Amino acid sequence: MTKRERLKNRIREELAQHPKIDRGTLMGWLAQGEYRRVLEELFFFTESPEFVHLCQGIMQDIEMSFPSMRESGQECCLGFLAEFSIWLQSYLPNWHLLNGDKDALSSVSERQLTALAARAALLIAKLAQDATGHVGSLTARWRKDIASRLAAESVPNPQQAAAALVGEDIGSYLTNMTASLRSSNARGIADLHAKGATPTEISNDYAAFLDYAMLLGASFVTCNPPLVDIAWVADPERWNPVVDRIVQEDPGASSEALATKVTLEIVLANMRLLRPVFLLTEGCTGYVSLQVNPRNHDNSSAMVSEAITIYSDLEKKLGGGVPNVVFKLPATHAGLVACRDLTGQGIGVNITVGFGMFQHVEFAQALQEGEAIVSTITNMSGRLAFPVRDELLGIVGRLAKSGIGEVELREAAAWSGVAVVKRLHQLMARRGYDLGRVKPLVASLRVYEGGAYEGLPTPVPDISEVIGVGVITIFPNVRRAFDALPPMKLRPHAVESPVPKNVLDVLRHSEVFKQAFYVGDPELLPEEDDQLRPDHPLCLDDEADVLEWTPVRNTIAEFCKSYDAFETRIEDRRQLAGRVVA
């Protein structure tokens, strides 16, 4: 039995050992304020034939016992019913209740879900008549939470927008939230995935607000030092006490050690949210991507040691379960050595700081040979497009003599990451790689708006033109822009469509793009256009040159700077705690 098979067996065993929870226990959890735990039990671990009856019974119990409940219990039950109604109309039932692999008799129908949501809404309206104080408390909390999320989505005046979304009562909140979920283009991609029409999964490119992203169908999370820090800033009431506890438990620890522990806590919180999806899919999805210390980008042994230590810690925190985590490694020679070591042990990785085919081809082969259940190869599309754009703008006068204006070059640059992703997908399919296990992942998405980009198919080609790839990880503001577009006719296999020839005619003037796009292997790509050959093709063995290549250099520098800032924030918190104690 291979390592991968043993890992999958452990996941199956954990799911099989999940205890069956009765109605009384679920009501007890509600009384204790644990309504998310109740929701997860119902939606992910209750067998479909029992689901409707159990939900009806819980609503009946709430209605009968509500008048005699404590005030905290009443508020919790109203909150539960509201979230229950939203979950019913979200993507979440697709993971288990609407599972297309089941026959009609063992699945819940959309009609049944709609009926349950309607019943929950009626019950809320009835109970809320004599609980106006609880309604006010809940809507105030929702406005605060949603305002934080909308701020991350770069919405102007997020407090005002949150107030409009929540409305004056729970009924308005349910109506508006449901409409928002149903109109989401990102949700549309997830729905295609649920139907088996596209392999593309959507991911939350953020270490916060995963609960909302999961309503839209997110099944993956990508984290790096800036994103972990952002999660802390987004919810200081939650994470300040956690950081303080970590500092107090080990006051003499180095800043680096404390940064690792804080990262671990934020990652673990996201892992727990995705854990049911991970179990239900036998480890095929439901992962959190955790970046090792970016300062070790050229030290394979340090990266491996850090990953193994964290993996072991997470295993313990999960009670011996297989951690639903993949480790971000840089697409460098040292990263390749670390990749082979970790995946040989069955530990999944996400190859990051990736921009070019000379990186992707090597790592795809290594991951195919590895033992991990799932690994990903990230193409950082926007972080490639901007250096390409800047390079072309630097020669705009020369290009003008060839009839290429600024609008054409800006538009072409926006295609550069898309072009690399399409080529990567093409070559991996041509080689017969297992694309369910070795997944191309598109990250660093950009929104292109204004007159220079009117010729693009959409303002977000990094999404619309690569559907059909393994994973698309979406930053909140990009998802907001994508969802703000009119309902789209999504193409399930858009990644297979070629890049327009006129775009490549412009991009051949960029050395940065040619370095990224060029394969240089006649066996892999005999039809390759020699006009797209860079002056000095890179390979991973040229580690010093790779680290100096503009997109790699810029990204590693930013990650290291962000990691330093993260450590500084922790040090500031340590100093503050010391002053408070003194």
Give residue ranges: language-model regions.
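Short, surface-exposed connector motifs at secondary-structure boundaries
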Residues: 316-325, 340-349, 433-438
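Catalytic alpha/beta core domains of metabolic enzymes, predominantly
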Residues: 336, 348-500
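N-terminal capping/small domains of soluble enzymes
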Residues: 56-241, 334
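Generic structural signal for well-ordered alpha-helices
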Residues: 263-275, 304-311, 339, 360, ...
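A solvent-exposed, charged loop/short amphipathic helix patch at secondary-structure junctions
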Residues: 238-253, 391-412, 529-537
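C-terminal extensions of enzymes
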Residues: 2-6, 11-12, 16, 21, ...
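Conserved, mostly hydrophobic/aromatic
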Residues: 224, 290, 327, 342, ...
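Active-site beta->alpha loop and helix N-cap motifs at the rims of alpha/beta catalytic domains
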Residues: 217-218, 227-334, 546, 556, ...
